[in-house]
UniProtKB/Swiss-Prot annotation:
The gene is metK. It comes from Oleidesulfovibrio alaskensis (strain ATCC BAA-1058 / DSM 17464 / G20) (Desulfovibrio alaskensis). It is an enzyme of class 2 (transferase). GO terms for molecular function: ATP binding; magnesium ion binding; methionine adenosyltransferase activity. GO terms for biological process: one-carbon metabolic process; S-adenosylmethionine biosynthetic process. Pathway: Amino-acid biosynthesis; S-adenosyl-L-methionine biosynthesis; S-adenosyl-L-methionine from L-methionine: step 1/1. Residues 103-113 are annotated as: Flexible loop. L-methionine binds at residues 60, 103, 245, 276. Binds 2 divalent ions per subunit. Mg(2+) binds at residue 21. Keywords: ATP-binding, Cytoplasm, Magnesium, Metal-binding, Nucleotide-binding, One-carbon metabolism, Potassium, Transferase. This is S-adenosylmethionine synthase.
């Protein structure tokens, strides 16, 4: 458990959409979206691997829809920005291999029900949600600001502000905390792929000027004179993306969530339809935790939900303030049980999860971005939670 007394540092990282693991995540979720758009009841478990000049898709899919998998892959890669074979990965020329089977009937019989309200969980496991009052979107400060840097790094590449940047990149932010509260940014790390001709001096100047300062100066935590800044510290990052590292779906689960703050059940999200509680349960956990904090019941909240395959009701539910509230965890947990139906069908219905919304979630965090598609970021249950906690 993270200490809440004294001074300490906490660090989180983010990657851009051109990072090979994120390329894989986006392809998996692009396939999911194409199928959900045609058939909202699609069962999808789509895994992707990308490497030099090649993308491989495998998994289990049962659907009434159709996906032109090579075209989905190429469109996604093109949108990310791998548009030249010199990068080792080019949307026009990369090979696309696929191996797709139907969902196992053994799993399907545990999930499908004549009464859809009693739909069983698609797997066993535990999922976590987290929220805290460190940022306006109730996310931990380190991951929030790391994602802001990654998004800006991509933006200045795509709009041509810094024309020598390439798609792959990573950011990292370390915060100093005092008695559990973030007080300043202690150090920042940015690594970005770049064109062959770009000099280290030009890269450092561009990242400081166009990425770090515009993003972090408004935060209130950043003093450049009192912050270590590390930019492309190997001195060269020309070979990147799937040419530099093999990318796989589901290998960035910490930055997909809370940057290491709070717990993680281990399940990845991308490529999975809402019947997979790895995804829908974690989204519901975030929704609950965010509403608990927004309701003023606790400045920090962690929710755990656990399921058994084929069983609709969770086998356990916990809502804890991690010692940050005068309201007991027992009261918080009972309030959550009173307000929210945590059966998979009702999670999907409440959050309207059977929509083609997932490709947007596949990079820069599934949580903490308050866009219309992300229903789990709403705070529309605060009144119900306050009333339940008073009972």
């Amino acid at each position: 458990m993270i200490p809440y007394k004294g001074k300490y540092h906490f660090t989180s990282e983010s990657v851009t959409e051109g990072h090979p693991d994120k390329v894989a995540d986006q392809i998996s979720d692009a396939v999911l979206d194409v199928l959900l758009e045609q058939d909202p009841d699609s069962r999808v478990a789509c895994e992707t691997m990308v490497t030099t000049g090649m993308a491989i898709i495998a998994g289990e899919i049962t659907t009434r829809g159709y996906a032109d998998l090579p075209q989905v892959v190429r469109d996604t890669i093109k949108e990310i920005g791998y548009n030249n074979s010199s990068m080792g990965f080019d949307w026009q020329t990369c090979a696309v291999l696929s191996s797709i089977d139907k969902q196992s009937p053994d799993i399907a019989q545990g999930v499908d029900r004549q009464d859809p309200e009693n739909q069983g969980a698609g797997d066993q496991g535990m999922m976590f949600g987290f929220a805290c009052d460190e940022t306006p979107t109730l996310m931990p400060a380190p991951i929030f600001w790391a994602h802001q840097l990654s998004q800006k790094l991509t933006a200045v590449r795509k709009d041509g502000t810094v024309d020598f940047l390439r798609p792959d990149g990573k950011t990292q932010v370390s915060f100093e905390y005092v008695d559990g509260r973030p007080v300043r940014i202690n150090n920042v790390v940015v690594s970005t792929q770049h064109a062959e001709q770009a000099s280290q001096t030009d890269i450092i100047d561009a990242i400081r000027t166009h990425v770090i300062r515009p993003v972090l100066e408004p935060s209130g935590f950043f003093n450049e004179k009192d912050c270590e800044i590390f930019i492309n510290t190997t001195g060269r990052f020309v070979i990147g993306g799937p040419m530099g590292d093999c990318g796989l779906t589901g290998r960035k689960i910490i930055q997909d969530t809370y940057g290491g703050m709070g717990s993680h059940g281990g399940g990845a999200f991308s490529g999975k339809d809402p019947s997979k509680v790895d995804r829908s349960g974690a989204y519901m956990g975030r929704y609950i935790a965010k509403n608990v904090v927004a309701a003023g019941l606790a400045p920090k909240c962690e929710v755990q939900i656990a399921y058994c395959i084929g069983v609709a009701d969770p086998v356990s539910v916990l809502c804890t303030s991690l010692g940050s509230s005068d309201i007991s965890d027992e009261v918080l947990t009972q309030a959550v049980r009173d307000v929210f139906d945590l059966r998979p069908y009702h999670i999907s219905k409440r959050l309207d999860l059977r929509r083609p919304i997932y490709k947007k979630s596949a990079c820069y965090g599934h949580f903490g971005r308050e866009i219309p598609e992300f229903s789990w970021e709403r705070t529309d249950a605060v009144d119900d939670l306050r009333a339940a906690a008073r009972r």
